[in-house]
Amino acid sequence: MFKLLKFLIKFILTILIIVIIGLVGGCIYLNSAYGINVIDVFNQLKIMNEEINENEYIENKFSNEDLDSSKNISSLNNVINKNGDGTYTIDPDKISMLEEDIYLTDKQIGAIVNEIFKKEMEKNGQEYSKYNPEVKEVTFSNITPTSTYFTYMVKLDCSSIKEEYNTFPFTLLKNYIPNYLYLSMTSSITHLEKPFSYEINYVSTKISKLTDEQTFSFLNTIKNVTQLDFASEIYTSLSTTLINLMIGNENYEDGFTYSLSKNALSGVKDYTFKEENGNRYYVIKRGLI
């Protein structure tokens, strides 16, 4: 978790570096030293600064209603608890015995993973809370009997960085740093032979309103300037964290589904993904007790 948070902050600071080089070093230097088109970079930053209407931009947005509908599943009734102040608590230890497999939509999984993610932040990442990273979307696609594409979107509040770097020359950069970043990543999850064993592989990345091509160009610019592969960093730091929070295994025991299975009487034995009648599901599988 700390690696994830440090990566996100490093990502924002790298944007600062690129802008400084562009303003101080000039177009000719960047083009000759790194092969970077400064005009393209500033256009990309301009797009990243555009205000985003989440209701229009996030196609598969989840809400508390998805937590409530998950709570209505009998086996999860005591796992998902709504507090008096409207917040939620997830307690896998309170799982009831499964009478059948549990089918959860991608919206329900997004809502559950976001709650677990927030609790992890409260426990282990208080110094990063000002950046308020939160899961905004989860979708499943390309579902086969053994694999699926898992796409998520994380929102990061960058406004506090503008307040921290309030001396010259950083004061010149405020207009180039977005208030919020929306990082989207698609990974493939392949189920291996044993229960709760899976392999995660990188597929694609997208940043805010940038197109796929613009995102690739921007990440390539960062790589050229810093020698850091941020697409790989996002994959290893962010994707694996969120997927492990959803599934889990003996190496990541806090994963939601694996935590449910640790209660031997629950009957939870594994996970899978299914598509039925045009609907996509994450399935918590019941085994013989």
Predicted regions and their residues:
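Extracellular/lumenal and peripheral-membrane lipid-interaction modules
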Residues: 3-289
